[in-house]
Amino acid sequence: MLQFATAFLAISANVVMTQPNQEYIAPGARVSSNYRDMTIRRLRTHEIGTVPEERMPIHELEIEDLITIIASKVVPELSHSESMSLLSAEAARSRSFKDMAADELDVDGALDLLKAVQSKPETTDMTPTFGVWEESNFDSATVEKLFDSKKNDENESHIKTIVEAYKKFRKEK
């Protein structure tokens, strides 16, 4: 009877060791190629064929693809936080240009225009930039705000030149 119980336990232990729990990944397990292979196998048992990389042999997977697969299946919060950061970045881009400083964003060529006027004030063609500002419904006060971060003694006269030229451009339209 004792031999039967010992044999039964040995067979049971062998079955448990060769067929690990498909739902559980040990938190303290070492990261190794065997652990990676086992993780991918477990992921494949849950959702087979949802991502093209999952159908590839494990040794052909790039590490970035492996991280993406694991992050999207094992830790969905990572994927969610990434999408949330993309949404917040899109919201920041869609804010009104009037609220953004010229250092944050070169608003429709304002800084390029200032550099051009500094180098060749008489020959600089400002109408393309003025056309963009006109389409954005910028008034002369808004145009002045574009240059607030670049205002100093050296640039002040050039900025006044640009603002005055823009006022004249708006009157002509």
Curated annotation (Swiss-Prot):
Motif RxLR-dEER — list its residue ranges: 41-55
Glycan-modified residues = N155
Q: Which UniProt keywords apply?
A: Glycoprotein, Host cytoplasm, Host nucleus, Secreted, Signal, Virulence
Signal peptide limits: 1-18
Does Glycoprotein count among this protein's keywords?
A: yes
Q: Is DNA-binding found in the keyword set? A: no
Upregulation details from the record are:
Expression is up-regulated during the late plant infection stages.
Main location, first listed in the record: secreted
Q: Which GO terms describe its cellular component?
A: extracellular region; host cell cytoplasm; host cell nucleus
Could you give the domain comment from the record?
Answer: The RxLR-dEER motif acts to carry the protein into the host cell cytoplasm through binding to cell surface phosphatidylinositol-3-phosphate.
What does this gene product do?
Secreted effector that suppresses pattern-triggered immunity (PTI) in plant host.
Name the UniProt record assigns to this protein: Secreted RxLR effector protein RXLR-C12
Naturally occurring in which organism (per UniProt): Plasmopara halstedii
What's the encoding gene here?
Answer: RXLR-C12
